Amino acid sequence: DMGIQIHTVVGNHTAYYKDTNEINTIDLLLKQYDNITTYAETEEIKLGNLSVLLIPWINSENEETSFDAIKNSKSKVAMGHLELNGFRAHRGHVMEDGMDIDIFDKFDKVYSGHYHTRSDNGKIYYLGNPYEMFWNDVNDPRGFTIFDTETTDHFHVDNPYRMFYNCLLYTSDAADDIPG
């Protein structure tokens, strides 16, 4: 036992039903571990001396309580599984059907999953996937993010392994046109 505590929020792919977070794969698979806490509802927690608002997937069941918690939070940092407008969901697609970001103006920093690629506006940070999943992920940096609870700084650790590569095929007729 290394004494590591894991805090995780329910996301849209871990919730079994689209309108509730109550039944989710994180609880079902990992509830026997004492060091893992799953958040199916929005909740403020302390990480060291830092208060952080954790926001799971917002759905019809928890929408009102989630927005109330966001509005009333005293935390300076929020972390969640959010679907916000104006960020790249994946290469070639910027989200336009999500939530407005204005509700998060009160926070110094917001970190989120959900979108599969990294993007940010200087205040809200989408962390992306730790690994490539689809062909359109090629050459899109993947990895994980380290967050410092004392300074609220973060940095990305890139995954050095890739699944997808761009390959160019030249026919023998075109080979004469290749420089070098």
Whereabouts are the PLM-identified features?
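Active-site donor-binding loop signature of nucleotide-sugar glycosyltransferases
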Residues: 57, 82, 129, 149, ...
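A conserved active-site cap/scaffold subdomain adjacent to cofactor or substrate pockets
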Residues: 119-120, 125-149
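Charged, glycine-rich active-site and insertion segments that engage polyanionic ligands
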Residues: 155-167
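His/Asp/Glu-rich metal-coordinating catalytic cores
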Residues: 1-120, 124
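Transmembrane beta-barrel architecture of outer membranes
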Residues: 142-144, 164, 172
